[in-house]
Amino acid sequence: MACAGPASGRHGVSMQEHMAIDVSPGPIRPIRLISNYFPHFYPFLEPVLRAPDRQAMLAPAIPSAPQLQPNPEPEGDSDDSTALGTLEFTLLFDEDNSALHCTAHRAKGLKPPAAGSVDTYVKANLLPGASKASQLRTRTVRGTREPVWEETLTYHGFTCQDAGRKTLRLCVCEDSRLRRRRRGPPLGELRVPLRKLVPNRARSFDICLEKRKLTKRPKSLDTARGMSLYEEEEVEAEVFGEERGRILLSLCYSSERGGLLVGVLRCVHLAPMDANGYSDPFVRLFLHPSSGKKSKYKTSVRRKTLNPEFNEEFFYAGHREELAQKALLVSVWDYDLGTADDFIGGVQLSGRASGERLRHWRECLGHCDHRLELWHLLDSVPPQLGD
């Protein structure tokens, strides 16, 4: 049995509808007909929306009380990358001195996991590459979410080839040691492809920090480097090549002393050989073939570092024509107490070398009293002695 429609073209109104009141802003007043606010449905028929009244549409609209709209959240707050804050810094590729300078200025709007103040520092890494070999950091600024560092971090031995293939990663980290907290992930990080840099021209950045994307370190890398306990934290799974590091050597033929001065200045980005992620490096020098004079030297050991500075100089007596027929073998080792030292990398300078190694050797012996400093990439195999 069909339900009868409302008489006189009007819908029936229930007692609940009569008891409704208007809660819009302004004086409280009852609602005469709630159907004017909501569609009216009959209990036994298909829901039918009320047809619009054409005359009411043509009549002038009665202004109603203004409705309060919720304030939309700032656009940046809805994005995780911009909610972590921003970092201001400047990069300068000093091509003449083979150096990359990164000046960390300040951070703004940091969002630490815990309430209150935070102690922060900036950590830098060159990717791809060994994590600790290229890791630099600023000092810690305490008790603020708007830290100002104004500190410059310098990567030595940085070349145009590095600028074309490497990326600089900057992380804003909380120094949990000062507050005896458990070390957590960085507050935010960013990455800058260094191919964008113009040599000898500073460039400033103000970039939003992002969440760090972490994966487990490949076990093959740890095993190959003897690094089974290298890092407990998760690091980037960027498989870098077998780059063993670089060494800065200076050569000068002294006409006054009648011999070759070899300076071992520094090494950078050495391969870690110890379980703690570092090495105890030193450098060995050998002039081959030996003429019975002093031909072997070695530097002192630098403890627990992958970027050692030596600044030590050694002398090989001999005429330029005699030295031109010889080869200088330079090797970097990791010192181990009680066991055999581990080979890190080496380089050979001679008339039979090629590239920068050959140029370094020829220019040194071709010009007296001319000191020439050049960076050399270390080979992963020990230098071979010729006949």
Swiss-Prot record:
PROSITE patterns: C2. Pfam families: C2 (PF00168). Its cofactor is Ca(2+). Keywords: Calcium, Metal-binding, Repeat. Ca(2+) 1 binds at residues 274, 280, 334, 336. Residues 83-209, 243-376 form the C2 domain. Ca(2+) 2 binds at residues 274, 334, 336, 342. GO terms for cellular component: membrane; presynapse. One of its GO terms (biological process) is spontaneous neurotransmitter secretion. GO terms for molecular function: metal ion binding. Transmembrane segments: none annotated. May be involved in regulation of vesicular trafficking. In vitro, does not bind calcium and phospholipids. This is Double C2-like domain-containing protein gamma. The gene is Doc2g.
